[in-house]
UniProtKB/Swiss-Prot annotation:
The chain crosses the membrane at residues 121-141, 207-227, 298-318, 327-347. One of its GO terms (molecular function) is ABC-type transporter activity. ATP binds at residues 431-438. It is a multi-pass membrane protein. The gene is ABCB27. This is ABC transporter B family member 27. The keyword Transport applies. CDD domains: ABC_6TM_AtABCB27_like, ABC_MTABC3_MDL1_MDL2. Residues 396-633 form the ABC transporter domain. Expressed in the vascular tissue of roots, leaves, stems and flowers, in the distal portion of the root tip, in leaf hyathodes and in anther filaments, pistils and flower receptacles. Induction: Not induces by aluminum treatment.
């Protein structure tokens, strides 16, 4: 309704309504203790960012701690499998030495054939044992990885659900979805599957080097000359890649956020013919991600190309020197063959470790983003445990309440609001748009805490009341209610504590004037309403939301009337349902209808965060002030006198 929106309040401190006024609370904001657990305090709410966490791999691997027993068994299987794989070159070299002998007599030939057969049998046994251990290792580590990602996603989602509303004011939904899906998947691979492969390659490399020493210590030392150089290169490469990966994932999250927003607002996009614009915006962010990805690809390509060149030159050098030793009798052909096989196996393992290190650095970037949320402490405590005894009669009091949204701390919305809602009373909030009407409702619902002052329910501060108890006593019905993508029955029963009977659900729907249109659906109460209730009209969503509030039977009702978006019939049905909902309850209504204001016990006009006028409808008209002007303006803009 533009500047015709209204709000109620109580007595307030009067400091004037000029825009130049700056309240004294703002002077002390920097001195207030910061409730947020991050180093930047509430800075992440003001700027939309949280300081990235420094996450060691020990913390990532700790995610698999509940599966430690299975991973130990998997590690034992891994060690056995790695050892068996390295025994094959040893017996292969023995076969080469056997067939290289100078065999002259039939007895020697028979002896050689028996020796070869025995070696082949041993190799087959080694392969069978190694295959069984490899299968066992893969099963245990992969099953553990699935449990790791499930636990991580549950923990992350649980933590997100307990963040304060202000956190969601500044955080994009697409970014959170990216952390829940993509980042957790990367961490899953690092914590288990990649760990398995890393252990296998490390074990293979160490055991392989041991066998290389038994074959020729001279060749082994020559082969290990390149290791220090490669180690330094890998460390520097990994450090740079970790930062680049973190930046790439952040850019991808922005693109995901644009996509999520576009899908959620597809009707708005279509109504303005902005499909091409949204595609362009998404493409720009994808191109930014692509640019970073291509930079990463070039870096990885150069690194692995150099690594391959170093290994290849090392192998050529070792083989050349090995041939020299063989020619001069210091090694047998079989020993040289075994050594070459060992060196190739070790080289392959080290090369795989480099690849795994690259993946691990990407996981480190993802881990920073995930643990950044897991380490974040909500700036609002929900640890109150009081449940006021006696009749929950809905006595609400705002006492000298000051408030500024955490995302805009320099802009004070409420300036010393004091307001009393006596049990069973109906208080209408009216006033110019932006005055603070919705903010008052948000504070009573405890979506935010005031900077100064108190809000009491039945004489107890909201901050001391149990989170569950508070929201069973207070219910809110907004202009644009949000429904969940489930059945009508499930949506109505959503706020009910326990298992709601179908009879109770049906009665609530009847009181909300929703039963008739629900019964007209082919699936009746089993009808799925779609995401955010998009398959229903505005009036239908309103009435289901009213039925949901009726079923919870709150003692305090916060109501934001919605009339401008409804046709006359829907408006009548919704208003009639609201009248049923308000009966016998303490009601705070952000009023848009003249009929609502007339029947209110108290009307409060909120202007510039203060209560400018307060009284009944007739009392305020007699003042010839802001309220009178609002009524006159509405009457001039419409031939109907039913709305305000």
């Amino acid at each position: 309704m533009g500047n015709k929106k209204l709000l109620t309040g109580g007595s307030s401190k009067t400091h004037g309504s000029g825009s130049s006024y700056r309240d004294p609370l703002l002077q002390n904001q920097e001195d207030k203790p910061k409730a947020n657990g991050s180093e930047n305090g509430l800075n992440d709410l003001e700027h939309g960012v949280v300081e990235a966490a420094n996450v060691g791999f020990g913390r990532v691997f700790a995610l698999a701690k509940p599966d430690a027993g299975k991973l130990v068994i998997g590690t034992i299987a891994l060690l056995i499998g790695s050892t068996t794989n390295l025994l094959v070159p040893k017996f292969g070299g023995m076969i080469i030495d056997i067939v290289s002998r100078d065999v002259k007599t039939p007895e020697q030939q028979t002896e050689s054939l028996i020796a070869v057969r025995n070696a082949v049998v041993i190799i087959l046994l080694i392969v069978v044992i190694g295959s069984i251990c490899t299968a066992l290792r893969a099963w245990l580590f992969n099953s553990a990885s699935e449990r790791v990602v499930a636990r991580l996603r549950k923990d992350l989602f649980r933590h997100l659900m307990h963040q304060e509303i202000a956190f969601y004011d500044v955080t994009k939904t697409g970014e959170l979805l990216s952390r829940l899906s993509e980042d957790t998947q990367i961490i899953k691979n690092a914590a288990t599957t990649n760990l398995s492969e890393a252990l296998r390659n490390v074990t293979t490399a160490l055991i392989g080097v041991g066998f290389m020493f038994t074959s020729s210590w001279k060749l082994t030392l020559l082969a290990l000359v390149v290791v220090p150089v490669i180690s330094v290169a890998v460390k520097q490469f990994g450090r740079y890649l970790r930062e680049l990966s973190h930046t790439t994932q952040a850019a991808a999250a922005v693109a995901a956020s644009i996509a999520e927003e576009s899908f959620g607002a597809v009707r708005t996009v279509r109504s303005f013919a902005k499909e091409s614009y949204m595609v362009s915006q998404y493409s720009k962010k994808v191109d930014e991600t692509l640019k970073l990805g291509l930079k990463q690809a070039v870096l990885v390509g150069l690194f692995f190309g150099g690594l391959n060149a170093a290994f290849t030159l090392s192998v050529i050098t070792v083989v050349s020197y090995g041939a020299y030793l063989t020619i001069y009798g210091s090694m047998t052909v079989g020993a040289l063959t075994s050594f070459i096989l060992y060196s190739l196996t070790v080289g392959s393992s080290v090369s795989s470790l480099s690849s795994l290190y690259t993946t691990a650095m990407k996981a480190a970037g993802a881990s920073r983003r995930v643990f950044q949320i897991l380490d974040r402490v909500s700036s609002m405590s929900s640890s109150g445990d009081k449940c006021p005894v006696g009749n929950p009669d809905g006595d609400v009091e705002l006492n000298d309440v000051w408030f500024a949204y955490p995302s805009r701390p320099s802009h004070m919305i409420l300036k010393g609001i004091s307001l009393r809602l006596t049990p069973g009373s109906k208080v209408a909030l009216v006033g110019p748009s932006g005055g603070g009407k919705t903010t008052i409702a948000n504070l009573i619902e405890r979506f935010y805490d005031p900077l100064k002052g108190k809000i009491l329910l039945n004489g107890v501060s909201l901050m001391e009341i149990s989170h569950q108890y508070l929201h069973k006593q207070i219910s809110i019905v907004s202009q644009e209610p949000i429904l969940f993508n489930c059945s009508v029955e499930e949506n109505i029963a959503y706020g009910f504590d326990g298992e709601a009977s179908f009879t109770d659900i049906e009665n609530a729907a009847k009181m909300a004037n929703a039963h008739e249109f629900i019964e007209a659906f082919p699936d009746k109460y089993n009808t799925v309403v779609g995401e955010r209730g998009l398959r229903l009209s505005g009036g239908q969503k309103q009435r289901i939301a009213i039925a949901r509030a009726l079923l919870t039977n709150p003692s305090v009702l916060l109501l934001d009337e919605a009339t401008s978006a409804l046709d006359a019939e829907s408006e009548y049905l919704v208003q009639d349902a609201m009248d049923s909902l308000m009966a016998g309850r303490t009601v705070l209504v952000i009023a848009h209808r003249l009929s609502t204001v007339k029947t209110a016990d108290c009307v409060a006009v909120i202007s510039d965060g203060e209560v400018a006028e307060k009284g009944t409808h007739d009392e305020l008209l007699s003042l010839n002030g802001i309220y009178t002007n609002l009524v006159k303006r509405q009457l001039q803009s419409s031939s109907s006198v039913t709305t305000l």
